From Swiss-Prot:
Reaction catalysed by this enzyme: 4-CDP-2-C-methyl-D-erythritol + ATP = 4-CDP-2-C-methyl-D-erythritol 2-phosphate + ADP + H(+)
Record keywords, A-Z: ATP-binding, Isoprene biosynthesis, Kinase, Nucleotide-binding, Transferase
UniProt-listed HAMAP family: IspE
Organism whose genome encodes this protein: Petrotoga mobilis (strain DSM 10674 / SJ95)
Transmembrane segments: none
EC number: 2.7.1.148
Pfam families from the UniProt entry: GHMP_kinases_C, GHMP_kinases_N
One term of GO molecular function: 4-(cytidine 5'-diphospho)-2-C-methyl-D-erythritol kinase activity
Function in brief: Catalyzes the phosphorylation of the position 2 hydroxy group of 4-diphosphocytidyl-2C-methyl-D-erythritol.
Gene3D superfamilies: 3.30.230.10, GHMP kinase, C-terminal domain
Highest taxon above the source species: Bacteria
The protein, known as: 4-diphosphocytidyl-2-C-methyl-D-erythritol kinase
Sites where the protein binds ATP: 91-101
Amino acid sequence: MHLKAFGKVNLYLDVISRRKDNYHNILTLFQSINEHDDIFIEFSESEIFESEPPLNISWDNNIIKKSIETFKKETGFDNFNLKIKLIKNLPMGGGLGGGSADAAAVLNFLSKNFKISEKDLFEISCKIGSDVPFLLKGGTAIGKGKGEILEFLEPLKLNIQIYPMNYNIDTKKMYEKLDQNWKSINHFGDPYNLYEALKNNDIITAKQNAFNVFEQVAFKEYPKLKQKKEDMEKDEGIIFALMSGSGSTLYKVIYAN
């Protein structure tokens, strides 16, 4: 079976506070994008995984394997193996949720085959990664907590152009940079105001509320990202440009319907 694992951008992303479990509370506006990985998957006598191009992480550390193992543990359906071929189109470490999208696609495949409830599948996804719960369904949603507290909204119809940059940014490192510089970090905008502005083609309000807190640390580490974003903001017809996730992918929103 051929699965499409659609990525996401964060139209708004702020880090609100650090949690006792060493994670962070975030506030974000998730938006699905057309860009996706392709996954060819079938049940098999033995576990087989291959990727084009080859990944720079081992299978044991792959979030797809984590999703399969977590599914087996949580459901008790553990007497199966999968043959998976991943065509990796979304950039690694790019902020588009590529690995999480792959995990979500495989979970949806397993859920349909083993008839797992939506509630149970959601709970499994929360154990795998912060973006996985949203990517199970996709569309447009406000995310809170670690990203797993979701408020799905009427999907926005946006023209989003993606600009992958040649930096594999470590999310953990970016959170550490935020923590180290917390007192000097600025927070502004509102994801609900941004959503309404994009829904109603209110360009001025959209510009005022589009925000990614990670730009304040990522742009110091990678100055070329800042320069590229500033160049993009000069483009004709643009509503706003932003970095997605903890980086490094940049994107621009051209118009909203």
